[in-house]
């Protein structure tokens, strides 16, 4: 609470584990008063951390890294509100998600936030999925988090959009060159 009072700005309250059974996942607070109101009421048995609140223009990008290359798959967005407009803050897990097939990185998330990691991916021999979530603020993307997973909302949608999901994921796990193929007409996915 002292940090919020000293900084005088809102924070997103997050759980570092976020398992399906976690007592909290994310609580988006848009004012310092919201943040201060939530802190004493949170079950912090798994710990919490505060993430700077930068607004609502949030998006994610999911790619596969294999054989030293980054293969963009989709841009995704999680639904964090139960209704259209500002009718309440998020107090729990996302309600669902959208994915857009995006091998060309239409919004620049991979170019700005994943490509700079390519030397590190190669140095350590990383292979697998990588997801970045960011907020667009002051005309640039600001990283909120990186994850090395497809995610429970986006993973099944990506698999259903790919014509060769087993081959693509299998080759990625082995660190082999990838050639993801897309099902015709599968441009978007939605999960509620």
Across the structure, where does each feature detected by a protein language model lie?
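A conserved helix-loop-beta module that forms one wall/lid of the active-site cleft
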Residues: 1-26
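Short, active-site-adjacent cap segments at secondary-structure transitions
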Residues: 18-21, 137, 191
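Short, conserved active-site entrance elements at the starts or edges of catalytic domains
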Residues: 39, 162-176
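A short glycine-/small-residue-rich loop at the edge of a beta-strand within enzyme catalytic domains
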Residues: 153, 157-161, 182-183
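A glycine-rich beta-turn/hairpin centered on an aromatic-Pro dipeptide
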Residues: 170-192
């Amino acid at each position: 609470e002292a940090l919020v009072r000293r900084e005088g700005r809102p924070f997103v309250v997050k759980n570092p584990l976020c398992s399906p059974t976690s007592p909290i996942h994310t609580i988006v607070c848009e004012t310092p008063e919201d943040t201060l109101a939530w802190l004493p009421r949170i079950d912090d048995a798994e710990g919490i951390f505060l993430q700077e609140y930068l607004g609502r223009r949030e998006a994610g990008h999911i790619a596969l890294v294999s054989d030293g290359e980054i293969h963009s798959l989709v841009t995704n967005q999680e639904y964090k509100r139960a209704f259209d407009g500002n009718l309440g803050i998020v107090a729990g897990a996302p309600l669902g998600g959208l994915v857009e097939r995006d091998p060309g990185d239409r919004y620049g998330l991979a170019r700005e936030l994943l490509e700079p990691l390519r030397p590190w991916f190669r140095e350590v021999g990383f292979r697998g999925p990588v997801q970045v979530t960011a907020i667009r603020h002051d005309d640039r993307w600001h990283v909120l988090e990186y994850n090395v997973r497809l995610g429970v909302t986006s993973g099944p949608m990506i698999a259903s959009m790919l014509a060769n999901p087993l081959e693509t994921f299998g080759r990625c796990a082995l660190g082999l060159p990838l050639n993801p193929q897309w099902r015709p007409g599968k441009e978007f996915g939605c999960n509620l």
